[in-house]
Amino acid sequence: RFQTIIHGDAKLANFCVNAREAQVAMVDYQYVGRGCGIQDVAYFLSSALSPDNCATREEEALSIYFTALEAAIMRHQPTLNATEVVEEWQRLYCWAWADFVRFLAGWAPHHYKIDRYSLQLTEDVLRLLEKREKQL
């Protein structure tokens, strides 16, 4: 329901960081488009954290992100209900990660990022799909 402009390839290699000035820029906009911002977040975390850290730091990383997102929405888009956006994107995180796994499975089926954490999130999504199918 809540969409934004997404980068589409938000891996760590596409970020330029000036730590001294606390500035960040992104490059390589070949996949830019409209979508759910949590897609970029999931892809960024997959490239910035090791597989083990994805599992152990997920809650912390997402908490930092969603706190900043909520503040940014309230400042720049005050007519939006920031809580609704955050709640929707929180629910969609596992879907975004499962989509990343789908991409990896087609591109590099033995990629090291197709690990226990990635497979667990994908299984969670598959269970949600089965549950929805039974409700139809």
Per-segment meaning from a language model:
Residues Y31-H76, W97-D115:
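Active-site activation/catalytic loop segments of kinase-like enzymes and analogous catalytic loops
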Residues D9, D28:
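Conserved catalytic-loop position in the HRD/HxD motif
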Residues Q77-A96:
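All-alpha amphipathic helical-bundle segments outside canonical DNA-binding/catalytic cores
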Residues N18-Q23, R75-T83:
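Short, glycine- and charge-enriched coil/turn segments that flank and shape catalytic ligand pockets
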